[in-house]
UniProtKB/Swiss-Prot annotation:
Disulfide bonds: none annotated. Keywords: Ribonucleoprotein, Ribosomal protein, RNA-binding, rRNA-binding. It comes from Chlorobaculum parvum (strain DSM 263 / NCIMB 8327) (Chlorobium vibrioforme subsp. thiosulfatophilum). It holds the Pfam family Ribosomal_L27A. Gene3D superfamilies: 3.100.10.10. The lineage of its organism: Bacteria, Pseudomonadati, Chlorobiota, Chlorobiia, Chlorobiales. SUPFAM superfamilies: Ribosomal proteins L15p and L18e (SSF52080). Residues 1-62 are annotated as: Disordered. This is Large ribosomal subunit protein uL15.
Length: 184
């Protein structure tokens, strides 16, 4: 006996039922589906179909709104930054690009530094937002905080400025147009 001669026990494997192959087979014509009606047709009904009754998704009102220009914020704790410093993943200056790569946050727009955990490194951290406790801990350790004003995408589209400089320059304020009726 070898592997090529192994077979299942007799009667263990049931034969496939071939339907719709002529009246002599016993499962021809209607193929075991009965006569007419919804169950004999191909395809399926949607699970929300409720017969003639008004379906639930039409009975309930629409609600909510998704803003098209919504910006997402990635939060980073000081304990995490301290761990990166101890591992040698970042140097004396931590930029927004460093945060993006180390947080694995390719789809985040802004970065916020939170003051959770111990922090004893004198480093310069660039981010969009800082919590009060984070600023206190960074300055107590002898470090500095630098606020970035633009997202990485916005900074890459600024003409005439290097990327790092464009990140740190504030956006120009939007001026309101004067109405024609206001004559002064």
């Amino acid at each position: 006996m070898d592997l090529s001669s192994l077979r299942p026990a007799k009667g263990a494997v049931k034969g496939r039922k071939r339907v719709g192959r002529g009246p002599g087979s016993g499962n021809g014509t209607t193929a075991g589906k009965g006569n007419k009606g919804q169950q004999s047709r191909s395809g399926y009904t949607r699970p929300v179909t409720e017969g003639g009754q008004m379906p639930m998704y039409r009975r309930l009102p629409k609600f909510g709104f998704t803003p098209p220009n919504k910006k997402s914020v990635a939060c980073v704790n000081l304990a995490q930054i301290q761990m990166w410093i101890e591992k040698g993943l970042v140097g004396e200056e931590i930029s927004v690009l460093d945060l993006k790569h180390l947080c694995n946050a390719s789809n985040q727009d802004y970065f916020k530094i939170l003051g959770n955990g111990e922090f004893e490194s004198a480093v310069t951290i660039t981010a969009h937002f800082f919590s009060k406790s984070a600023v206190e801990k960074i300055e107590k350790a002898g470090g500095k905080t630098v606020t970035a004003y633009r997202t990485l995408e916005e900074a890459s589209k600024v003409n005439g400025l290097p990327f790092e400089e464009a990140l740190l320059t504030p956006k120009a304020p939007v001026l309101k147009k004067k109405k024609k009726s206001d004559k002064s």
